[in-house]
């Protein structure tokens, strides 16, 4: 079994967790998140602690137990991220590097000049918030860690950093190792 799942997830006082046969709901001050319940995993709430254990009663063979135990760590982390999301939220910061490269927000569209002959328009999903505090900085935030990361990756994909010059869209904490150019 996953070592991290041997510890319980501690629920803050302002977070409610409800479990049905088909889904897990976590409700907090920032919103509500849902997760499909997996038959391999058993989730128990005891007071303000959530325990995630393998549901070995469903296992038909000894080989299945390994898969079940692997899912425990995954579900422990998913539920923990849901709890963190509805209390604190998640944030990814992107930086635009390059002469003439910039971004601006118009309504729910992110409009970027990235060196193409046309402007790039990116529709911002309703469950994610995008801010542009400066023309070369984009902040993506929300309560669902997977959605925040995916939207940030989709924005970055429009102009990934050039391995020679470093121009493009990069994460603020990303370290680029630039390649050396040709030598004459």
Swiss-Prot record:
Signal peptide: none annotated. Pfam families: Ribosomal_L6. InterPro entries: Ribosomal_uL6-like (IPR000702), Ribosomal_uL6-like_a/b-dom_sf (IPR036789), Ribosomal_uL6_a/b-dom (IPR020040), Ribosomal_uL6_bac-type (IPR019906). Transmembrane segments: none annotated. This protein binds to the 23S rRNA, and is important in its secondary structure. It is located near the subunit interface in the base of the L7/L12 stalk, and near the tRNA binding site of the peptidyltransferase center. Part of the 50S ribosomal subunit. PANTHER family: 60S/50S RIBOSOMAL PROTEIN L6/L9, LARGE RIBOSOMAL SUBUNIT PROTEIN UL6M. This is Large ribosomal subunit protein uL6. It comes from Fervidobacterium nodosum (strain ATCC 35602 / DSM 5306 / Rt17-B1).
């Amino acid at each position: 079994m996953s070592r991290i799942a041997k510890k319980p997830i501690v629920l803050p006082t302002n977070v409610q967790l409800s479990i049905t046969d088909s889904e897990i709901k976590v409700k907090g001050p920032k919103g509500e998140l849902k997760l499909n319940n997996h038959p391999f995993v058993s989730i128990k709430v005891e007071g303000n602690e959530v325990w995630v254990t393998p549901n070995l009663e469903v296992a038909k063979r000894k080989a299945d137990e390994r898969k079940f135990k692997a899912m425990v760590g995954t579900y422990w982390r998913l539920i923990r991220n849901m709890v963190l999301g509805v209390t604190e939220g998640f944030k990814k910061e992107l930086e635009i590097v390059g002469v003439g490269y910039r971004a601006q927000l118009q309504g729910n569209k992110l409009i970027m000049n990235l060196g193409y002959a046309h402007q790039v328009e990116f529709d911002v999903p309703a469950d994610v918030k995008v801010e542009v505090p400066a023309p070369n900085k984009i902040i993506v935030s929300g309560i669902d860690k997977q959605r925040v990361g995916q939207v940030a990756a989709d924005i970055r994909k429009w102009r990934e950093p050039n391995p020679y010059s470093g121009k493009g869209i990069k994460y603020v904490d990303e370290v680029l190792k630039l390649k050396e150019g040709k030598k004459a």
